[in-house]
Amino acid sequence: MTITDLVLILFIAALLAYALYDQFIMPRRNGPTLLSIALLRRGRVDSVIFVGLVAILIYNNVTSHGAQMTTWLLSALALMGFYIFWIRTPRIIFKQRGFFFANVWIEYNRIKEMNLSEDGVLVMQLEQRRLLIRVRNIDDLEKIYKLLIENQ
């Protein structure tokens, strides 16, 4: 096993740990989930570039008769990238005392101001940061509004 294979195993393990945390652990942290809303995906260009580069590495490894283990590890890395970037749905998860947005816990008392833009983007101003929440279904904005009013 080469150092390349060890690095690939490390990256696959990191992506798998992130996927498990995002899918199973995060919704169970900080109390019961009150509301979980699907968000729009950000640009997919980065994911296409990543999976494309891994596909080029697989092709290069196969044509140069590289180690089969490396080919399998690169394939697993491509599948993990495909899952994380294309199959997994980003979500905002509301709890009793706060919410998870982009895997970061934010308490409700940190929200200083909220606005709704013309194109349906909910803008939350925190102390030093502004969150742009783009929901997949525009009707979910009303659910978020009702939940925030009830918890404030």
UniProtKB/Swiss-Prot annotation:
One cellular-component annotation, GO: plasma membrane
Transmembrane segments: 6-26, 45-65, 67-87
Entry keyword set: Cell inner membrane, Cell membrane, Membrane, Transmembrane, Transmembrane helix
The keyword Magnesium is annotated on this UniProt entry: no
Membrane association type: Multi-pass membrane protein
Major location category of this protein: membrane
Pfam families named among the record's database cross-references: DUF986
Cellular compartment(s): Cell inner membrane
Transmembrane listed as a keyword: yes
InterPro entries the record matches: DUF986
Similarity comment: Belongs to the UPF0266 family.
Name of the protein in question: UPF0266 membrane protein YobD
